């Protein structure tokens, strides 16, 4: 199997077959992200994709889930994605779901009919970096869209029958807008009903614009207590059915997961217990390690 550079996947895709169809990220301008900074965006050849599928058939002939790599394969045209999906079903006839990273910008390039066709071919459960529902935060993070566009494109996705997983970043609006960020993001999430929410807190590694902003003081990272407050309000406002809340990323102050609405009160209890446990550190700003991990 061919993989170029560092290959990323969501933690919940650990058992999926990883098939490279693009390299890098077509946007690659988010202010906080360095995942693909050194990997130019390119499209894998169908010859290589078919070669990898032939290899995959030898060790995972009954694979039921395929995750397309890398940063945002949904940047491909609908026709190209259809061609890839048909090849997947040819080599792996048990495959039911073809998932991948995408962005709001790449939904925009597909017609309603194309989205329906892709869903018919098993493309579903797209992982999307929503990050925030607050326009000021989206601008700061240089996402390339606003909340109105996100609501519209996610509505089109859902109308086509596609589920999506939402990545949400706490603290993305800065310490002065935590309440606004939590409220706006919860409103967007409630209106677009993802099947999964993947949370993290704002952080930046060297070589990205946000890192420079943090070092210069142009952006002030929220404190541990502020991160807890924002997550508590966000969670309180969620009104979803059968949605997995995945908060185990090491950048989180509170690490937990559960199903909404079933585990909502239990998770809120965990948030409040964490506030009590870290009472002496609530005014501190997180000390970060690899992948934004906070040592607590």
Range-by-range predicted roles:
Residues 1-13, 190-296:
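Auxiliary Fe-S-binding modules of radical SAM enzymes
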Residues 5-51:
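Canonical Radical SAM [4Fe-4S] cluster-binding loop centered on the CxxxCxxC motif
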Residues 25, 33, 49, 68, ...:
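Conserved, mostly hydrophobic/aromatic
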Residues 49, 81, 111, 150-151, ...:
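Aromatic/hydrophobic pocket-lining residues that form the small-molecule binding cavity
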Residues 58-163, 239:
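Conserved SAM/AdoMet-binding glycine-rich loop
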Residues 63-69, 127, 164-168, 197-201, ...:
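Short beta-strand segments at enzyme active-site cores
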Residues 105, 133-137, 157-181, 200-206, ...:
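Conserved strand-turn element in the central/C-terminal portion of the radical SAM core barrel
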Residues 113-115, 174-191:
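Catalytic cores of alpha/beta
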């Amino acid at each position: 199997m061919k993989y170029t550079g560092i290959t990323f996947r969501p933690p919940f895709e650990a058992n999926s077959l990883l098939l490279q169809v693009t390299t890098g990220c077509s946007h690659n301008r988010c202010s906080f992200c360095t995942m693909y900074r050194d990997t130019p965006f390119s499209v894998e050849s169908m010859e290589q994709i078919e070669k990898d599928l032939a290899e995959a058939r030898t060790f995972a002939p009954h694979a039921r889930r395929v995750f397309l790599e890398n940063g945002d394969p949904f940047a491909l045209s609908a026709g190209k994605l259809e061609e890839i999906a048909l090849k997947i079903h040819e080599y792996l006839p048990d495959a039911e779901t073809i998932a991948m990273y995408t962005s709001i910008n790449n939904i925009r390039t597909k017609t309603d009919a194309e989205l329906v066709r892709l869903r018919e071919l098993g493309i579903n459960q797209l992982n999307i970096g929503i990050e925030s529902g607050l326009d000021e935060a989206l601008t700061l993070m240089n996402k390339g869209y606003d909340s109105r566009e996100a609501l519209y494109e996610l509505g089109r996705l859902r109308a086509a029958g596609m589920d999506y997983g939402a990545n949400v970043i706490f603290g993305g609006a800065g310490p002065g807008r935590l309440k606004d960020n939590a409220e706006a993001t919860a409103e967007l999430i409630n209106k677009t009903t993802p099947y999964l929410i993947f949370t993290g807190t704002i952080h930046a590694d060297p070589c990205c614009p946000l890192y420079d902003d943090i070092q210069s003081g142009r952006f002030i990272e929220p404190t541990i207590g502020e991160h807890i407050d924002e997550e508590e309000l966000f969670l309180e406002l969620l009104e979803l059915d059968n949605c997995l809340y995945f908060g185990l990323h090491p950048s989180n102050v509170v690490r937990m997961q559960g199903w909404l609405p079933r585990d909502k009160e239990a998770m809120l209890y965990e948030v409040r217990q964490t506030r009590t446990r870290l009472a002496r550190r609530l005014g501190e700003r997180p000390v970060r390690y690899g992948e934004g991990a906070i040592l607590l």
